[in-house]
């Protein structure tokens, strides 16, 4: 008879088989009411799951991330039930959980409208209130295929046909609705109390463009209405900060259909781009990196040697010339090895740090493109360090310092660090993996950093550290990485002469601080809601004359500031001063310098900030000093000086 071990180490013994629900009820009525599922020996199961043997059991509630995912998954099924009741001819396909929500793909004869979404959501609320029990059943494969074909659900039948022969075919029933699913699910629809349908988008069946186009309905679901409301508020705030909207409003960049996934940078946006690029250039140059530049178009033979032709070909732009196949480079690493390979290298030459603002192209599906965040053409602040095994730890430690300086200078201080270790399928001896993983771990520990371990998540060619930023809305963005590579240098013939005269293959460290510059600028725009720190702002101050009498004075101030390398404009238009102030405030210019007859007489400027603060009258030299001091702080606040 089963003995159940609970998370606190206590044991409960039963003289008969029990369900997860039975155990929850034996612990307490409150837990039984809150229970959504169980985790039996680490495996997530329904509350109705029967336990016959001794196991370790955790009761899963909506305070558990798995519990929240179950709510979202079950809400996707609730949506499918509502769609079938309202649109019986619709076919149901797949509906997984995604970050903060879920989606379900449907095949239907016409596009779903906004009114349809409202009707579906209303029907979902009605079905949830009916509090249907959710039952799991195991079916025979042929019986399941026959049932779904009879119901007109061809996609479900196809899914079952493609499952491995040994796979258990389980279905879940709630009310009159029945759906194919591995589960687990919440025990009844009454547990689904806080959800919102968000949008409809197109999606190909199984993600293949030669398959049918389906309709994907996205939604979000939360344990309670308070959390839902907070999430919708964050979404609304994110919408205000959308870099695409701000990019148009501030005339920074645009995208158009003739070049999908590739940005057209306008003068002000390009100024931001150059400032970010130049910052990284100065930072890396000061840490011993040498900047290089490599070709955009490279013969397929190099990509075959590196392994990218076999593994990455679908994401490459390929062309042919004079009977030779070329690929526009999707990454820079094989080209950097070619630079390393020019000339004999000694152990005295290592570590060798090669950096490039490498322009890469990847043939991302058009449906995944999103402003600057997901593009087809991007520039990486890419670098590769060629070193010995014994140099890994110091190089990683130096890179960690570099990363944190950069993030702090850009105004980010909340960084999540993850160490990914060896997967089951890998190259290289275990002793080498031991050494590399220890070096990465030791570098993190010596820096006094908190980090998360991701066992088995490393690449097949080496372990890695990933750096993820949190922005002002609490969203996470994976940016920096340093990746140990035991494979590529050997594949591409990289060697060095060791101290004992033997030839050895160097270790290669792939590393980036920002990753895609385009994506990082999109993150910056949203983090600051377009109000970039003065050092990054495309226009740092604007001089505004009240009447034509101050025009010459305004031009002299503009000229003087520009001679100091500052980005200052003079707006001499014949417009009311209030209009000009409002316009430049909306453009998020950090400072507006108003000049009238009094300012001309006293050689001063009346300073206003984009936040609406009136700093009063300042001598031109005093404001110049203030602005230069603020720029020198970069993205750091006064308290960090």
From Swiss-Prot:
MF-aspect GO terms: ATP binding; metal ion binding; threonine-tRNA ligase activity; tRNA binding
Co-factor requirement: Zn(2+)
Region (Catalytic) residue spans: 242-533
EC number, as in UniProt: 6.1.1.3
Domain of life: Bacteria
HAMAP family per record: Thr_tRNA_synth
Keyword RNA-binding: yes
Family: Belongs to the class-II aminoacyl-tRNA synthetase family.
Assembly and interaction partners: Homodimer.
Chief localization: cytoplasm
Organism: Alkalilimnicola ehrlichii (strain ATCC BAA-1101 / DSM 17681 / MLHE-1)
Protein name: Threonine--tRNA ligase
UniProt entry keywords in alphabetical sequence: Aminoacyl-tRNA synthetase, ATP-binding, Cytoplasm, Ligase, Metal-binding, Nucleotide-binding, Protein biosynthesis, RNA-binding, tRNA-binding, Zinc
GO biological process: threonyl-tRNA aminoacylation
Cellular component aspect of the GO annotation: cytosol
